[in-house]
Amino acid sequence: MLISKSIFLVEDDKEDQEFFTECIDDIENATIYGVANNGREALDKLENSTKLPDMIFMDINMPYINGLECLTAIKKNTRLKDIPVVMLSTDTGQAQLSCILGAKAFIKKPADCKLLHAKVEQMINLDFIIDSKIANQSFQFAY
């Protein structure tokens, strides 16, 4: 049996927060670590937390600090850089830039729960099989 992984959701849209939270709650090996409404709030929570999430699902288009800026800050922070980040957006044109900036995967919104479940399970299994530093080298696109 795999150990449950915590997922930090960074999403400004309340309906999307509810959708992703419900989908993640339905995944046997995943729990919600917390929710942030924008990149600034996410960085504050991560930098002030003693226990970090196992992975982050983050929207790109958000106020204050957008998802790409937040991803860049996470990857520059020695304490946070190894947390796998999955970027979420309606704009598939952002997938390549997300990869270049260090995201492990990209999911096109609106997503469906089946796709989200498959991606989370895939990442949990990959992390279980391979050391996370090696696993972070692969990038996956889903839509």
PLM features per residue range, with description:
Residues 50-57:
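Active-site beta3 strand of CheY-like receiver
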Residues 69, 91-108, 115-118:
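Alpha4 helix (beta4-alpha4-beta5 surface) of REC/receiver domains from two-component response regulators
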